[in-house]
């Protein structure tokens, strides 16, 4: 498969968002789906004529290629301030919200940086026991009180995943946070990456307690209002905590603004929205996916070709390449694994 302009592909496996049966990493190739992997490189090749001069294709040629990708709903590519591609061959369009699936984890990462910058959380090394002891159940796994913000943000809590075969039991439990904090330790905290939406949900609850604002309020205040992004309410757990790490929704244009924020060191329209040093920390490799081998920062995958990527089931993508001055947003059919073009 050609690497194209973007030089990376996304292989999406089953995710919890639809049937609620499983929740697998958005970068994990499912053994039955590998040949149907969604190739972002094709989209890169489609956009390349506007970015470089490698191919002599007309805009109609590019639109034809995009239209031929049956699962693709929308794609926006921006270089600098120039719109390279803005197409929505199907789906709700560019200006109506779409479920961004596990791209939500990357949004939680940005909210974490803001909470630290504002002093609601003292540092990345602060622990659950220090910040939000009230969320820890009496029968929690010993040691969870010492889990740090960084452990949660990098999916290195060491707790057994709530994803995969455990997902159904988790979301059908009467307390999602307690369920996740009662999982046995299967690795040392701060050790290997264990993809688990439950870990990000714990972080979301910690953010809510630490800031005194729920995730919806934080998302709207930190990102929605400054960037002009519509962020509707999404799923809440039985205790009222917004789902941390899944089910958020944005328009494709809103997703593109998040991408430009990452590309431009946390700046948007001349304002510093997220501290630049947090963007730097977020785009450093803190661990590595055991499935794709990609490095993982503070909620963002890091491609070998230089892209910073938020990924969600079915082909939901927010990506930035600072060196190439590129910002990308892609939405796809959220009910099916992504396919190649």
Question: Can you annotate each of these PLM segments?
Answer:
Residues 230-231, 276-328, 337:
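Active-site Gly/Thr loop motif
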Residues 88, 95, 163-246:
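Catalytic-site signature segments of enzymes, centered on catalytic residues
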């Amino acid at each position: 498969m050609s690497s194209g302009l973007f030089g990376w592909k996304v292989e999406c496996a089953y995710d919890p968002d639809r049937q609620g049966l499983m929740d697998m990493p958005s970068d994990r190739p499912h053994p039955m789906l590998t040949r149907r992997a969604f190739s972002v490189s094709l989209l890169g090749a489609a956009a390349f004529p506007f970015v470089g001069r490698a191919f002599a294709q007309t805009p109609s040629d590019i639109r034809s290629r995009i239209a031929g990708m049956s699962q693709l709903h929308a794609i926006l590519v921006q270089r600098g301030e120039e719109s390279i591609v803005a197409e929505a061959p199907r789906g709700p369009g560019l200006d109506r919200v779409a479920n961004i699936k596990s791209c939500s984890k990357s949004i939680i990462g940005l909210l974490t940086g803001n909470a630290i910058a504002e002093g609601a959380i003292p540092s990345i090394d602060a622990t659950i026991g220090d910040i939000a002891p009230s969320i820890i159940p009496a029968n929690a796994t010993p040691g969870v009180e010492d889990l740090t913000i960084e452990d949660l943000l990098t999916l290195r809590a060491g707790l057994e995943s709530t994803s995969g075969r455990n997902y159904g039991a988790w979301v059908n439990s009467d307390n999602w946070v307690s369920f996740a904090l009662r999982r046995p330790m299967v690795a040392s905290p701060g050790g290997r990456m264990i993809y688990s939406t439950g870990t990000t949900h714990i972080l979301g609850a910690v953010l809510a307690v630490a800031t005194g604002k729920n995730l919806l309020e934080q998302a709207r205040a930190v990102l929605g209002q400054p960037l002009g992004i519509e962020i509707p309410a999404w799923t809440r757990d039985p205790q009222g905590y917004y789902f941390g790490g899944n089910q958020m929704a944005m328009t494709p244009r809103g997703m593109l603004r998040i991408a430009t924020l990452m590309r431009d060191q946390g700046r948007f329209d001349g304002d510093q929205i997220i501290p630049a040093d947090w963007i730097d920390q977020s785009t450093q490799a803190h661990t590595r996916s055991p499935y794709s081998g990609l490095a993982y920062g503070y909620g963002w995958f890091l491609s070998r070709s230089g892209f910073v990527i938020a990924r969600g089931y079915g082909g939901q993508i927010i990506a930035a390449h600072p060196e190439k001055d590129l910002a990308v947003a892609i939405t796809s059919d959220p009910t099916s694994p992504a396919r190649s073009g």
